[in-house]
């Protein structure tokens, strides 16, 4: 793949086996990698934008987000064939001015007021203090895929807004 590549457009690399992306790549558009990126989780050093469903990861693994990332679309990453207990999520560089992650790999706005991604650990899902808004489709609660599962308790849902 050329080192001068700065953007991958919709379906641009779908079906291509990709082991790494050039560090100067700045933008991954919607569905840009398709199934080609299932086994590599490190994002290019200078990447700025991740579009909707731009990455599909087979089974598990955390996506590394560098300090240069300015925008992550809702549902930018899809973990396929994952189940309760699989490790997934994000590891955001501390120097990133827009996003942060916690020890679980959950994704938040830098100020911690918006939760974009989280997955169920055990039988209860606890929304951390300080979170004011939660992206509803970013909660992986397992019982019936992405929706709130039977018997799953969301602790703190009465004090946040879902969008």
Predicted regions and their residues:
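Solvent-exposed loop and capping/linker segments of extracellular ligand-binding repeat ectodomains
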Residues: 1-163
């Amino acid at each position: 793949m050329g080192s001068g590549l700065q953007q991958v457009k919709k379906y641009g690399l779908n079906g291509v086996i990709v082991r790494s992306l050039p560090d100067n790549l700045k933008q991954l558009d919607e569905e840009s990698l398709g199934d080609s990126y299932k086994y590599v989780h490190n994002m290019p050093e200078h990447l700025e934008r991740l579009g909707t469903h731009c990455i599909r990861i087979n089974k598990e693994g955390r996506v590394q987000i560098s300090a240069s990332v300015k925008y992550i679309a809702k549902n930018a990453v899809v973990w396929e064939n994952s189940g309760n207990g699989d490790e997934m999520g994000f590891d955001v560089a501390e120097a990133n001015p827009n996003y942060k992650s916690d020890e679980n790999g959950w994704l938040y706005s830098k100020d911690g007021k918006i939760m974009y991604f989280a997955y169920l650990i055990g039988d209860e899902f606890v929304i951390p203090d300080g979170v004011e808004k939660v992206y509803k489709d970013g909660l992986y609660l397992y019982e019936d895929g992405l929706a709130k599962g039977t018997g799953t308790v969301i602790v703190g849902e009465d004090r946040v807004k879902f969008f």
